[in-house]
Regions:
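Thiol/disulfide oxidoreductase modules built on the thioredoxin-like
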Residues: 115-117, 127-188
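N-terminal targeting signals for export/organelle localization
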Residues: 1-45, 195-198, 202-206
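Sec-exported extracytoplasmic/periplasmic mature domains
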Residues: 58, 77, 84-91, 113-117, ...
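A short beta-strand-turn-helix
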Residues: 37-63
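Second-shell loop/turn segments in exported
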Residues: 67-71, 97-98, 174-175
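Conserved segment of the thioredoxin-like fold in thiol-based oxidoreductases
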Residues: 87-134
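Hydrophobic beta-strand anchors of alpha/beta hydrolase catalytic cores
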Residues: 64-65, 96, 154
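Conserved redox-active cysteine motifs that mediate thiol-disulfide chemistry
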Residues: 67-84
Length: 206
């Protein structure tokens, strides 16, 4: 029995810490965190003009802002999932906005190819040297993201609950410090974009 126990311990010690890490993923749970998220105006990839966040989210029920580096393998894992969720819920008031980091705008365009991105993309930084200077880095520190580059990093905003004026949009928000867990986030989005009010009930008439 002691030999069997020793064999089990050695096997566990030599195994990868998680199957996610072994598969090259950095999945993270959806959690509510204090983030002190601020509004921004950043240059759009398609328009080459400043795009204001408040304008981009008008009329939406839920918005996922995803910060990413186009060269990052974990972002490339998440990108098809983000596009899939956007396609599924966009007609129900869901919006995705991508914020590119640590790569040139030309590199971002090359990543998305001739078809271009399926949702709006804006640029916050264009050099890896900017890593510790970006708002993205600051938000990651507040939410406990200890990864090196923090790509992807996802934050969910509910426009109806955001501050109507001022730079600060919200103190708290739901975030994912890594790749989305598709089933979990799918359910979350579905619950947020579902009708919040039931139709009026007509009383019975005799």
């Amino acid at each position: 029995m002691n030999k069997l126990l020793l064999l089990i311990i050695l096997t566990l010690a030599l195994s990868p810490p998680t199957t996610w890490a072994q598969a090259g993923h950095e999945y993270s749970a959806l959690v509510e965190k204090t983030v002190n998220y601020k509004s921004w105006s950043l240059v759009g990839l398609k328009t080459d003009k400043p795009e204001d966040l408040r304008s981009l989210i008008v009329g939406k029920k839920l918005v996922m802002v995803v910060y990413f580096a186009p060269w990052c393998g974990n972002w490339r894992n998440e990108a098809p999932i983000a596009a899939k969720l956007y396609e599924k819920y966009k007609d129900q008031g869901f919006q995705v906005i991508g914020v590119s980091e640590y790569a040139s705008r030309d590199d971002v365009r090359k990543y998305f190819g001739e078809a271009g991105p399926p949702y709006p993309i804006v640029t916050e930084s264009e050099s890896r040297d900017d890593k510790q200077k970006t708002p993205h880095y600051g938000y990651r520190q507040l939410t406990g993201d200890s990864r090196n580059w923090g790509s992807p990093w996802n934050i969910f905003l509910e426009p109806s609950k955001l501050n109507a004026t001022g730079d600060l949009l919200t103190e708290k928000a739901w975030v994912v410090n890594g790749e989305l867990i598709e089933d979990e986030v799918d359910k979350f989005i579905g619950s947020k974009v579902a009708a919040t009010t039931a139709g009026a009930i007509e009383p019975c008439k005799n």
